[in-house]
């Protein structure tokens, strides 16, 4: 998938790191509400082998960029304009999040908004990158 600047990212590019893949859209209120806790999680694990990839579902770069400029978030935003990737992951509800281990295997999947600063979620991710 392309990021907001047009660079292509593949999950394989992140092998060796845990990846939180979050599917979202600007029209999805729960998606917008969970973004700050995703950023807190990212910051709390800064410097470790962990990355957040936020996949915007069905919207264009301008819509996604406008959103990101209003909210200071330090993770990578990707665009799934045709929703094929979203469907391939089985993300029928937004937000949908998948935690992929450093080996590339999906370890956890969550449907609906979460508070990513919860200790149990942080501990599950930390266990993957220790």
What are these regions (language model features)?
Residues 20-22, 52-54, 99:
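Hydrophobic beta-strand core positions in alpha/beta domains
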Residues 24-27, 31, 89, 116:
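Signature tryptophan residues that serve as conserved aromatic anchors
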Residues 32-71, 81-88, 123:
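Structural microenvironment flanking redox-active thiols in thiol-disulfide oxidoreductases
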